[in-house]
Protein backbone atom coordinates (compact mmCIF):
# COMPACT_ATOMS: atom_id res chain seq x y z
CA UNK A 1 0.00 0.00 0.00
CA UNK A 2 1.29 3.45 -0.89
CA UNK A 3 2.65 5.80 1.76
CA UNK A 4 2.85 8.80 -0.58
CA UNK A 5 0.21 11.41 0.19
CA UNK A 6 0.02 13.86 -2.72
CA UNK A 7 -2.73 16.46 -2.97
CA UNK A 8 -2.88 20.18 -3.75
CA UNK A 9 0.92 20.46 -4.15
CA UNK A 10 1.49 18.84 -0.74
CA UNK A 11 3.79 15.81 -0.69
CA UNK A 12 4.04 13.67 2.45
CA UNK A 13 5.03 10.14 3.42
CA UNK A 14 2.41 8.75 5.79
CA UNK A 15 2.11 5.40 7.57
CA UNK A 16 -0.42 3.87 9.89
CA UNK A 17 0.62 3.12 13.45
CA UNK A 18 2.60 1.07 14.16
CA UNK A 19 4.24 1.48 10.76
CA UNK A 20 5.96 -1.90 10.61
CA UNK A 21 2.78 -3.90 11.28
CA UNK A 22 0.18 -2.47 8.92
CA UNK A 23 2.06 -1.92 5.68
CA UNK A 24 -0.86 -2.95 3.47
CA UNK A 25 -3.31 -0.45 4.95
CA UNK A 26 -3.17 3.23 4.02
CA UNK A 27 -2.79 5.96 6.65
CA UNK A 28 -5.38 8.25 5.06
CA UNK A 29 -8.39 8.06 2.76
CA UNK A 30 -9.91 10.11 -0.02
CA UNK A 31 -11.95 12.14 2.49
CA UNK A 32 -8.68 13.47 3.94
CA UNK A 33 -7.58 14.44 0.45
CA UNK A 34 -10.94 16.07 -0.26
CA UNK A 35 -10.74 18.22 2.88
CA UNK A 36 -7.26 19.49 2.00
CA UNK A 37 -8.30 20.05 -1.62
CA UNK A 38 -11.31 22.05 -0.40
CA UNK A 39 -9.13 24.28 1.82
CA UNK A 40 -6.87 24.98 -1.14
CA UNK A 41 -9.84 25.87 -3.33
CA UNK A 42 -11.18 28.40 -0.81
CA UNK A 43 -7.63 29.70 -0.21
CA UNK A 44 -7.82 29.04 3.51
CA UNK A 45 -5.02 30.74 5.44
CA UNK A 46 -3.45 29.55 8.68
CA UNK A 47 -5.83 30.22 11.55
CA UNK A 48 -6.79 28.75 14.91
CA UNK A 49 -7.97 25.31 13.81
CA UNK A 50 -9.48 22.28 15.53
CA UNK A 51 -8.77 18.96 13.81
CA UNK A 52 -11.01 16.12 14.97
CA UNK A 53 -10.79 12.37 14.25
CA UNK A 54 -7.58 12.64 12.19
CA UNK A 55 -6.67 8.93 12.13
CA UNK A 56 -2.89 9.13 11.73
CA UNK A 57 -2.19 12.82 11.25
CA UNK A 58 -2.77 13.32 7.52
CA UNK A 59 -4.79 16.50 8.07
CA UNK A 60 -2.48 17.91 10.75
CA UNK A 61 0.62 17.17 8.69
CA UNK A 62 -0.88 18.69 5.54
CA UNK A 63 -1.73 21.92 7.35
CA UNK A 64 1.69 22.07 9.02
CA UNK A 65 3.43 21.41 5.70
CA UNK A 66 1.75 24.56 4.38
CA UNK A 67 2.54 26.70 7.43
CA UNK A 68 4.82 25.46 10.20
CA UNK A 69 3.17 27.79 12.72
CA UNK A 70 -0.43 26.83 11.82
CA UNK A 71 -2.07 26.63 15.30
CA UNK A 72 -3.88 23.29 15.58
CA UNK A 73 -5.87 21.79 18.44
CA UNK A 74 -6.00 18.05 17.83
CA UNK A 75 -8.88 16.09 19.32
CA UNK A 76 -8.63 12.31 19.39
CA UNK A 77 -9.97 9.47 21.50
CA UNK A 78 -7.41 6.96 20.19
CA UNK A 79 -3.89 6.72 21.59
CA UNK A 80 -2.74 5.14 18.32
CA UNK A 81 -3.99 8.24 16.49
CA UNK A 82 -1.81 10.46 18.68
CA UNK A 83 1.20 8.16 18.34
CA UNK A 84 0.65 7.80 14.60
CA UNK A 85 0.45 11.56 14.12
CA UNK A 86 3.72 12.10 15.99
CA UNK A 87 5.32 9.24 14.03
CA UNK A 88 4.33 10.87 10.72
CA UNK A 89 5.44 14.34 11.79
CA UNK A 90 8.82 12.88 12.66
CA UNK A 91 9.04 10.94 9.38
CA UNK A 92 8.36 14.13 7.41
CA UNK A 93 10.67 16.28 9.56
CA UNK A 94 7.80 18.46 10.73
CA UNK A 95 7.86 20.10 14.13
CA UNK A 96 4.82 19.27 16.25
CA UNK A 97 5.22 22.42 18.36
CA UNK A 98 2.09 23.87 16.70
CA UNK A 99 -0.09 20.99 17.99
CA UNK A 100 -2.13 21.09 21.20
CA UNK A 101 -3.70 17.78 22.18
CA UNK A 102 -7.25 17.39 23.48
CA UNK A 103 -9.07 14.24 24.51
CA UNK A 104 -12.66 13.69 23.42
CA UNK A 105 -14.09 14.95 26.71
CA UNK A 106 -12.35 18.34 26.59
CA UNK A 107 -13.88 21.44 25.06
CA UNK A 108 -11.89 23.22 22.36
CA UNK A 109 -10.79 26.67 23.54
CA UNK A 110 -12.56 29.87 22.67
CA UNK A 111 -11.20 31.48 19.52
CA UNK A 112 -11.27 28.46 17.18
CA UNK A 113 -12.01 29.87 13.73
CA UNK A 114 -11.95 26.68 11.64
CA UNK A 115 -12.82 23.02 12.27
CA UNK A 116 -11.74 20.06 10.14
CA UNK A 117 -13.40 16.80 11.04
CA UNK A 118 -13.67 13.22 9.80
CA UNK A 119 -17.01 11.49 10.23
CA UNK A 120 -16.61 8.71 12.83
CA UNK A 121 -18.36 5.33 12.57
CA UNK A 122 -20.18 5.81 15.88
CA UNK A 123 -23.16 8.15 15.44
CA UNK A 124 -23.63 8.71 19.19
CA UNK A 125 -19.99 9.73 19.46
CA UNK A 126 -20.39 12.09 16.48
CA UNK A 127 -23.41 13.74 18.11
CA UNK A 128 -21.43 14.12 21.34
CA UNK A 129 -18.65 15.84 19.38
CA UNK A 130 -21.09 18.21 17.68
CA UNK A 131 -22.70 19.13 20.99
CA UNK A 132 -19.32 19.88 22.53
CA UNK A 133 -18.38 22.06 19.57
CA UNK A 134 -21.66 23.95 19.98
CA UNK A 135 -20.53 24.95 23.48
CA UNK A 136 -17.33 26.63 22.32
CA UNK A 137 -17.65 27.79 18.69
CA UNK A 138 -18.62 31.36 17.91
CA UNK A 139 -21.49 32.00 15.47
CA UNK A 140 -20.55 31.56 11.79
CA UNK A 141 -17.50 29.38 12.47
CA UNK A 142 -17.08 27.00 9.50
CA UNK A 143 -16.91 23.27 10.22
CA UNK A 144 -15.84 21.02 7.34
CA UNK A 145 -16.60 17.31 7.71
CA UNK A 146 -15.10 14.76 5.33
CA UNK A 147 -16.87 11.46 4.70
CA UNK A 148 -17.63 8.78 2.15
CA UNK A 149 -20.40 9.94 -0.15
CA UNK A 150 -22.48 6.85 0.68
CA UNK A 151 -22.45 7.83 4.38
CA UNK A 152 -24.03 11.24 3.75
CA UNK A 153 -27.79 11.57 3.53
CA UNK A 154 -30.58 13.93 4.50
CA UNK A 155 -30.85 12.46 8.00
CA UNK A 156 -27.16 13.07 8.69
CA UNK A 157 -27.36 16.69 7.53
CA UNK A 158 -30.42 17.19 9.74
CA UNK A 159 -28.53 15.69 12.69
CA UNK A 160 -25.67 18.14 12.17
CA UNK A 161 -28.09 21.06 11.86
CA UNK A 162 -29.87 19.99 15.06
CA UNK A 163 -26.71 19.78 17.15
CA UNK A 164 -24.42 22.48 15.67
CA UNK A 165 -25.78 24.50 12.75
CA UNK A 166 -27.06 24.36 9.15
CA UNK A 167 -25.20 21.94 6.90
CA UNK A 168 -24.89 21.13 3.20
CA UNK A 169 -22.80 18.65 1.21
CA UNK A 170 -20.45 19.26 -1.70
CA UNK A 171 -20.40 17.43 -4.99
CA UNK A 172 -18.79 14.00 -4.87
CA UNK A 173 -15.06 13.60 -5.53
CA UNK A 174 -13.34 10.21 -5.33
CA UNK A 175 -16.56 8.86 -3.78
CA UNK A 176 -16.36 11.38 -0.92
CA UNK A 177 -18.09 14.63 -0.04
CA UNK A 178 -17.25 17.54 2.23
CA UNK A 179 -20.06 18.71 4.49
CA UNK A 180 -20.01 22.42 5.29
CA UNK A 181 -21.64 23.32 8.59
CA UNK A 182 -21.85 26.89 9.86
CA UNK A 183 -22.01 26.94 13.66
CA UNK A 184 -25.05 28.84 14.88
CA UNK A 185 -23.49 29.78 18.23
CA UNK A 186 -26.22 28.11 20.31
CA UNK A 187 -24.78 25.85 23.04
CA UNK A 188 -26.36 22.39 23.31
CA UNK A 189 -26.47 20.38 26.52
CA UNK A 190 -24.40 17.22 26.59
CA UNK A 191 -26.37 13.99 27.04
CA UNK A 192 -26.25 12.06 30.28
CA UNK A 193 -23.98 9.03 30.45
CA UNK A 194 -25.61 5.69 29.70
CA UNK A 195 -25.84 3.52 32.83
CA UNK A 196 -27.08 -0.04 33.23
CA UNK A 197 -26.90 -2.89 35.70
CA UNK A 198 -25.37 -6.35 35.40
CA UNK A 199 -27.62 -7.80 38.06
CA UNK A 200 -26.13 -11.30 38.20
CA UNK A 201 -22.76 -9.84 39.22
CA UNK A 202 -24.11 -6.91 41.25
CA UNK A 203 -22.28 -4.40 39.04
CA UNK A 204 -23.38 -0.97 37.82
CA UNK A 205 -21.88 0.03 34.46
CA UNK A 206 -21.73 3.42 32.72
CA UNK A 207 -20.37 4.14 29.27
CA UNK A 208 -19.14 7.29 27.56
CA UNK A 209 -20.26 7.78 23.98
CA UNK A 210 -17.36 6.14 22.12
CA UNK A 211 -17.22 2.94 24.18
CA UNK A 212 -18.22 -0.38 22.60
CA UNK A 213 -21.46 -2.04 23.79
CA UNK A 214 -23.16 1.13 24.98
CA UNK A 215 -26.02 -0.26 27.08
CA UNK A 216 -25.65 -4.03 27.46
CA UNK A 217 -23.09 -6.82 27.67
CA UNK A 218 -21.72 -7.86 24.30
CA UNK A 219 -21.88 -11.58 23.60
CA UNK A 220 -18.12 -12.09 23.80
CA UNK A 221 -17.90 -10.44 27.21
CA UNK A 222 -20.83 -12.54 28.43
CA UNK A 223 -19.17 -15.88 27.68
CA UNK A 224 -15.88 -14.59 29.12
CA UNK A 225 -17.53 -13.56 32.39
CA UNK A 226 -19.03 -17.02 32.75
CA UNK A 227 -15.65 -18.71 32.27
CA UNK A 228 -13.02 -16.86 34.27
CA UNK A 229 -10.25 -19.27 35.33
CA UNK A 230 -10.17 -20.87 38.74
CA UNK A 231 -7.23 -20.20 41.00
CA UNK A 232 -5.40 -17.36 42.73
CA UNK A 233 -4.12 -14.36 40.78
CA UNK A 234 -2.16 -11.40 42.15
CA UNK A 235 -1.85 -9.11 39.11
CA UNK A 236 -4.44 -9.01 36.34
CA UNK A 237 -4.53 -7.03 33.09
CA UNK A 238 -7.82 -6.28 31.30
CA UNK A 239 -6.36 -5.66 27.84
CA UNK A 240 -8.68 -3.71 25.53
CA UNK A 241 -10.88 -3.12 28.56
CA UNK A 242 -13.70 -1.02 27.12
CA UNK A 243 -15.94 -0.13 30.05
CA UNK A 244 -13.88 -2.45 32.26
CA UNK A 245 -16.47 -5.18 32.81
CA UNK A 246 -13.94 -8.06 32.64
CA UNK A 247 -11.54 -6.41 35.08
CA UNK A 248 -14.35 -5.45 37.45
CA UNK A 249 -15.62 -9.01 37.59
CA UNK A 250 -12.07 -10.31 37.96
CA UNK A 251 -11.60 -8.13 41.03
CA UNK A 252 -14.76 -9.63 42.52
CA UNK A 253 -13.46 -13.16 41.85
CA UNK A 254 -9.88 -12.48 43.00
CA UNK A 255 -10.35 -9.81 45.72
CA UNK A 256 -6.66 -9.48 46.62
CA UNK A 257 -5.53 -8.85 43.05
CA UNK A 258 -4.36 -5.60 41.50
CA UNK A 259 -6.08 -4.95 38.18
CA UNK A 260 -4.62 -2.93 35.29
CA UNK A 261 -7.12 -1.63 32.73
CA UNK A 262 -5.63 -0.85 29.30
CA UNK A 263 -7.33 0.56 26.20
CA UNK A 264 -6.56 2.64 23.10
CA UNK A 265 -9.70 4.70 23.78
CA UNK A 266 -9.47 7.49 26.35
CA UNK A 267 -13.23 7.34 26.81
CA UNK A 268 -12.97 3.62 27.55
CA UNK A 269 -10.31 4.20 30.21
CA UNK A 270 -12.38 6.98 31.77
CA UNK A 271 -15.46 4.73 31.78
CA UNK A 272 -13.50 1.87 33.38
CA UNK A 273 -12.15 4.19 36.08
CA UNK A 274 -15.63 5.57 36.81
CA UNK A 275 -17.06 2.05 37.01
CA UNK A 276 -14.30 0.90 39.37
CA UNK A 277 -15.04 3.83 41.67
CA UNK A 278 -18.83 3.49 41.42
CA UNK A 279 -18.67 -0.19 42.35
CA UNK A 280 -16.21 0.48 45.22
CA UNK A 281 -13.88 -2.35 44.27
CA UNK A 282 -10.78 -1.26 46.18
CA UNK A 283 -10.23 -3.75 49.00
CA UNK A 284 -10.15 -1.71 52.24
CA UNK A 285 -7.82 -4.29 53.79
CA UNK A 286 -5.12 -3.34 51.28
CA UNK A 287 -3.15 -0.15 51.91
CA UNK A 288 -3.01 1.19 48.34
CA UNK A 289 -5.47 1.38 45.42
CA UNK A 290 -5.71 -1.81 43.41
CA UNK A 291 -7.13 -0.36 40.19
CA UNK A 292 -4.72 1.11 37.61
CA UNK A 293 -5.76 2.74 34.34
CA UNK A 294 -3.63 3.10 31.21
CA UNK A 295 -4.54 4.96 28.00
CA UNK A 296 -2.07 3.20 25.74
CA UNK A 297 -1.31 1.27 22.58
CA UNK A 298 -1.73 -2.26 23.97
CA UNK A 299 0.97 -2.80 26.64
CA UNK A 300 3.61 -0.58 25.03
CA UNK A 301 4.26 1.54 28.13
CA UNK A 302 3.03 -0.66 30.97
CA UNK A 303 6.53 -1.17 32.35
CA UNK A 304 8.54 -4.29 33.13
CA UNK A 305 7.80 -3.94 36.84
CA UNK A 306 4.22 -5.06 36.14
CA UNK A 307 4.32 -8.86 35.67
CA UNK A 308 0.74 -10.16 35.52
CA UNK A 309 -0.19 -13.75 36.12
CA UNK A 310 -3.47 -13.30 34.20
CA UNK A 311 -4.29 -11.25 31.11
CA UNK A 312 -7.92 -11.10 29.95
CA UNK A 313 -8.43 -10.01 26.35
CA UNK A 314 -11.40 -9.45 24.03
CA UNK A 315 -9.53 -8.13 20.96
CA UNK A 316 -11.08 -5.73 18.44
CA UNK A 317 -10.68 -6.56 14.76
CA UNK A 318 -11.38 -3.05 13.47
CA UNK A 319 -9.16 0.02 13.49
CA UNK A 320 -11.36 2.87 12.34
CA UNK A 321 -12.90 1.77 9.03
CA UNK A 322 -10.29 -0.95 8.40
CA UNK A 323 -10.68 -4.62 9.26
CA UNK A 324 -7.33 -5.91 10.50
CA UNK A 325 -5.92 -8.56 12.82
CA UNK A 326 -2.71 -6.68 13.66
CA UNK A 327 -4.25 -5.38 16.91
CA UNK A 328 -4.93 -8.92 18.12
CA UNK A 329 -1.39 -9.92 17.14
CA UNK A 330 0.10 -7.04 19.09
CA UNK A 331 -2.09 -7.80 22.10
CA UNK A 332 -1.00 -11.45 22.12
CA UNK A 333 2.67 -10.56 21.68
CA UNK A 334 2.56 -7.87 24.35
CA UNK A 335 0.79 -10.25 26.74
CA UNK A 336 3.46 -12.90 26.14
CA UNK A 337 6.22 -10.40 26.87
CA UNK A 338 4.49 -8.98 29.96
CA UNK A 339 3.31 -12.19 31.63
CA UNK A 340 5.39 -13.79 34.34
CA UNK A 341 6.47 -17.40 33.67
CA UNK A 342 3.46 -19.62 34.21
CA UNK A 343 1.07 -16.71 33.62
CA UNK A 344 -2.09 -17.15 31.57
CA UNK A 345 -3.59 -15.25 28.64
CA UNK A 346 -7.33 -15.86 28.27
CA UNK A 347 -8.86 -14.66 25.01
CA UNK A 348 -12.40 -14.56 23.67
CA UNK A 349 -13.07 -14.19 19.96
CA UNK A 350 -15.22 -15.21 17.03
CA UNK A 351 -14.46 -18.75 15.91
CA UNK A 352 -13.65 -17.71 12.35
CA UNK A 353 -10.78 -15.43 13.44
CA UNK A 354 -8.51 -18.40 14.13
CA UNK A 355 -6.85 -16.99 17.23
CA UNK A 356 -5.77 -20.49 18.31
CA UNK A 357 -3.29 -20.61 15.43
CA UNK A 358 -1.73 -17.30 16.46
CA UNK A 359 -1.55 -18.25 20.13
CA UNK A 360 0.14 -21.56 19.36
CA UNK A 361 2.76 -19.76 17.30
CA UNK A 362 3.53 -17.36 20.13
CA UNK A 363 3.00 -19.44 23.28
CA UNK A 364 3.60 -22.92 21.78
CA UNK A 365 0.40 -24.02 23.50
CA UNK A 366 -3.31 -23.20 23.48
CA UNK A 367 -6.42 -24.90 24.82
CA UNK A 368 -10.12 -24.26 24.37
CA UNK A 369 -11.72 -23.42 27.71
CA UNK A 370 -15.28 -22.91 26.47
CA UNK A 371 -17.20 -22.31 23.26
CA UNK A 372 -20.61 -21.79 21.76
CA UNK A 373 -21.83 -21.56 18.20
CA UNK A 374 -20.09 -18.23 17.54
CA UNK A 375 -17.44 -17.59 20.19
CA UNK A 376 -14.53 -19.51 21.65
CA UNK A 377 -12.48 -18.92 24.81
CA UNK A 378 -8.81 -19.82 24.51
CA UNK A 379 -6.13 -20.10 27.17
CA UNK A 380 -2.38 -19.98 26.62
CA UNK A 381 0.28 -20.37 29.31
CA UNK A 382 3.69 -18.72 29.21
CA UNK A 383 6.19 -21.47 29.88
CA UNK A 384 9.17 -20.74 32.09
CA UNK A 385 11.29 -22.26 29.33
CA UNK A 386 10.12 -19.82 26.68
CA UNK A 387 12.18 -16.68 25.86
CA UNK A 388 10.83 -13.39 27.19
CA UNK A 389 10.23 -12.17 23.65
CA UNK A 390 9.22 -14.34 20.69
CA UNK A 391 11.23 -14.28 17.48
CA UNK A 392 10.46 -11.35 15.20
CA UNK A 393 9.12 -13.59 12.44
CA UNK A 394 6.21 -14.55 14.72
CA UNK A 395 4.80 -11.08 14.18
CA UNK A 396 3.27 -11.81 10.79
CA UNK A 397 -0.36 -10.71 10.86
CA UNK A 398 -2.68 -11.54 8.01
CA UNK A 399 -4.22 -8.20 7.06
CA UNK A 400 -7.54 -7.51 5.46
CA UNK A 401 -8.88 -4.27 4.08
UniProtKB/Swiss-Prot annotation:
Keyword line: Cytoplasm, Methyltransferase, rRNA processing, S-adenosyl-L-methionine, Transferase
Enzyme class (EC, first level): transferase
InterPro entries named in the record: DNA_methylase_N6_adenine_CS (IPR002052), rRNA_m2G-MeTrfase_RlmG (IPR017237), RsmC/RlmG (IPR046977), SAM-dependent_MTases_sf (IPR029063), Small_mtfrase_dom (IPR007848)
One GO molecular-function entry: nucleic acid binding
One CC-aspect GO term: cytoplasm
Catalyzed reactions per annotation: guanosine(1835) in 23S rRNA + S-adenosyl-L-methionine = N(2)-methylguanosine(1835) in 23S rRNA + S-adenosyl-L-homocysteine + H(+)
Keyword Transport: no
Similarity annotation: Belongs to the methyltransferase superfamily. RlmG family.
Described purpose of this protein according to its UniProt entry: Specifically methylates the guanine in position 1835 (m2G1835) of 23S rRNA.
This protein's name: Ribosomal RNA large subunit methyltransferase G
